[in-house]
């Protein structure tokens, strides 16, 4: 009997041990399976991440290759050669060539201050199906607009686009194949400058070329500000450089201060002005720096190079990003500076305030 009981006890113990062994083996197998699954999941995630990174790198590489394959031809029509327009063209060319390198071809032409030549130049650009046209100065812009409604046109050194393009409802964009940058410095501040430096002024001569739309616009605005301040003024206009001397002589005979807006004809012939006004001690206020450096006293200046750079950035946006030129707002200079011609100021005995900066000449540079 004792032997049977002992046998049963031993059998029960062995069964219990077997059950424990089976349970341990099962747990171990489950842990191994879980570890395997986790390893497989981690491996799959890493593979997916690597694949995604490789795909992204490939896409970036393809984009860079596409960008490097871009090739464009840009036509530049500049109305006339003088320092302000030259600086705007230089800023534009520097910007697009830095971006595109050898993948941009620039056809730069100067119209020698002839509107008919502007038309001939831009017609050639259109016939050659250039990718973009830069029109430097208002007559160049008007000629380009007359020549094409398809090729993107950017203007620079254009004072007022609404006037230049005869736009009735101008909201900052032209709504046509045109955008660009303006060389307009605040006209109210220019009039303030006249009164600041010449508080006893009796009469201001407003002198400009009657065939330049932007000059007409600026003259009208300045005359309005002078009226508001009760300052007398008279208008003196010339058709071209041939009658500038007689017009300036008439102006100094009647007025004690001269104002000349940004005017391409005047800008190319400022020595005619200074040869008459400087010996008489008459202050001449100009619409921009380069005119002042040759034959004026003071100006509220912008950087023409900078507005050329801004136009270049617009060109890149149009050509490489496909931006619609008609939706790009006209750009304006972000900063203006009170500047003066130190030699002219000394010649007429004018002491300048401390917040006016002398214009650097080639000798000073």
List the model feature ranges, each with a label:
Residues 67-69, 161-203, 302-323:
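Hydrophobic alpha-helical segments within soluble ligand-binding/sensing domains
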Residues 2-23:
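Sec-dependent N-terminal signal peptides of Gram-positive bacterial secreted proteins and lipoproteins
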Residues 317-365:
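Hinge/cleft segment of the Venus flytrap/periplasmic-binding protein
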Residues 74, 92, 179-226, 324, ...:
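An alpha-beta-alpha
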Residues 213-282, 288:
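Pocket-lining segment of extracytoplasmic ligand-binding domains
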Residues 19-32, 37-48, 57:
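Bacterial lipoprotein signal-peptidase II cleavage site
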Residues 108-168, 260-278, 282-287:
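Beta-alpha junction/loop-to-helix N-cap segments that form part of ligand/metal-binding clefts
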Residues 67-94, 99-101, 107-117, 211, ...:
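Extracytoplasmic "Venus flytrap"
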């Amino acid at each position: 009997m004792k032997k049977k009981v002992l046998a049963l006890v031993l059998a029960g113990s062995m069964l219990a041990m077997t059950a424990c062994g089976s349970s341990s083996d099962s747990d171990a197998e489950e842990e191994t399976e879980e570890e395997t699954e986790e390893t497989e999941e981690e491996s799959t995630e890493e593979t997916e991440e690597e694949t995604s990174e490789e795909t992204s790198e490939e896409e970036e590489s393809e984009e860079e290759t596409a960008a490097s394959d871009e090739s464009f031809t840009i036509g530049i029509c500049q109305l006339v050669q003088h320092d302000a327009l030259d600086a705007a063209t230089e800023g534009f060319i520097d910007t697009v060539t830095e971006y595109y390198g050898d993948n941009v071809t620039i056809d730069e032409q100067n119209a020698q201050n002839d509107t008919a030549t502007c038309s001939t130049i831009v017609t050639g650009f259109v016939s050659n199906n250039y990718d973009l046209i830069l029109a430097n100065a208002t007559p160049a812009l008007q000629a380009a607009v007359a020549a094409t409604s398809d090729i993107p046109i950017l203007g620079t050194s254009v004072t007022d686009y609404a006037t230049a393009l005869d736009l009735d409802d101008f909201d900052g964009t032209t709504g046509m194949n045109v955008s660009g940058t303006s060389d307009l410095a605040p006209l109210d501040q220019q009039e303030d400058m006249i009164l600041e430096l010449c508080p006893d002024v009796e009469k201001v001569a407003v002198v400009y070329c009657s065939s330049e739309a932007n000059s007409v616009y600026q003259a009208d605005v300045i005359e309005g500000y002078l009226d508001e301040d009760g300052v007398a003024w008279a208008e003196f206009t010339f058709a071209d450089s041939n009658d500038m001397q007689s017009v300036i002589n008439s102006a100094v005979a009647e007025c004690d201060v001269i104002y000349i807006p940004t005017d391409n004809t005047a800008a190319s012939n400022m020595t005619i002005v200074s040869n008459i006004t400087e010996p008489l001690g008459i202050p001449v206020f100009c619409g921009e720096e380069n005119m002042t450096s040759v034959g004026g006293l003071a100006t509220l200046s912008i950087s023409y190079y900078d507005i050329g750079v801004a136009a270049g950035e617009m060109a890149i946006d149009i050509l490489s990003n496909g931006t619609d030129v008609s939706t790009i707002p006209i750009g304006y200079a972000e900063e203006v500076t009170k500047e003066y011609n130190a030699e002219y100021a000394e010649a007429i005995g004018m002491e300048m305030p401390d917040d006016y900066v002398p214009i650097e000449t080639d000798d000073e540079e």
